[in-house]
Amino acid sequence: MAIDTDRGLQTQVIYSVYVRAHTPEGTFRAIIPDLDRIRSFGTDIIWFMPIHPIGVEGKKGSLGCPYANRDYRSVNPAYGTLEDFKALVDEIHARGMKAMIDVVYNHTSPDSVLYETHPEYFYHDAQGRPANRFGDWADVIDLDYSNRELWDYQIESLRYWAGIVDGFRCDVASMVPYGFWKAARTAVKQVNPACIWLAESIHLSMGCEARRLGFAAMRDSEAFDVFDLEYDYDIREVFDRLLHGRCPLSHWTDMLNYQEAIYPDNYNKMRCLENHDQPRIASIITDMEALVNWTAMLYFLKGTTLIYAGQEWADRHQPSLFEREPIDRETGMNLMPLMKKLAAAKKTLFTGEDSFWATADDARKLAVMERFSSRRHSVGVFSLLGESAKVKVPLPDGEYLNHIGGNTVRVEGGRLFCDGTPLLLCEEK
């Protein structure tokens, strides 16, 4: 983590909004009436997926992908005007929340303003054509950060937006040089000293493949020096295998413990069950009792919690990045009361100083997780199948309040009965 990172971020909740999909109108101003609801279940920060104009050349689908950015310094007219966006941010601030925007600094659309004015800022293949370095991203071309004038342009754009919003989610941050991010953080600090920096660090396999092909890819340990928090994609592939039954729960909990062992004391991983690049969790975990446990476990994990808009309704459909597909608010499911309790517990029981440990019962797919602070020892018990079981827990015998369900749980002989609902118990010091 950056030396000046606010550890309080670890107890906060980010809510990810795709403007096109969030309302039937798909505009900035249409989001304003929804802000009170978003805040009501514990949201601290709203992250907007890219708000900039989308390129036409090579676009995917009828509307194009928001990550094929045409102009870093303006907003997508389909969403509204810059004044509309500023009004939205003002309303977010009025409710005590913060706003972040996506910055896509690895690439642009082929017809971007930047390519039209400065083609020398871009990567070119062996035939001299603008291209992307690898991956199936036919609607974008990669930037070339060996050109220091590009740094100046990008940093000036960041300084501009830092005067409006509270932070940046940096797309494919690992593929942009460490030195650039370090310079950008220093420059932006002059405009907004409290700016939040979130890195979309890349999957382990993608980083290895990039280096195999001769391209630099920033490692997570480097990213922690200049970002406040980063994705947990270093172990996401293990998590995905767990979700689909291709590895035991203990493999993933071992990876969580490995992160705790190797990263700086103040490390912060953004934890999510789903995001715009991943399938909806409710499309995989279809049993509601099980989904409640997975959701409770998400909030217990060490790190900032991410909720992707629609997750609170257990929406099973992943909105297309290339079309207009409003999220489904009529699923008949409502996880917001649960999320409100979990967010409150995260803020009141956990701290940015906590240490973490996790164990697993593979046969019953049951996780027991611990958080340790100077004030309390917290234990979470999560039955990921939603089934009842007798569970061994690292707590003295006695009665404990379940901070999720509100019921009392008794520990006898170092064991308790889990009825299939998530448990959060605390031993005060």
Language-model features and meaning:
Residues 2-15, 19-44, 50-162, 183-192, ...:
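Substrate-binding/active-site clefts of carbohydrate-active enzymes
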Residues 267-333:
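Aromatic/acidic polysaccharide-binding cleft in carbohydrate-active enzymes
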Residues 13-15, 46-48, 99-101, 168, ...:
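Hydrophobic faces of well-ordered beta-strands that scaffold small-molecule active sites
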Residues 171-264, 269, 297, 316-350, ...:
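Active-site-proximal helices and loops of the catalytic beta/alpha 8
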Residues 411-429:
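C-terminal beta-strand-rich structural cap/linker in extracellular carbohydrate-active enzymes
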Residues 359-395:
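Carbohydrate-binding surface patches
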Residues 401-415:
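Solvent-exposed beta-strand/loop surfaces of large extracellular or lumenal domains
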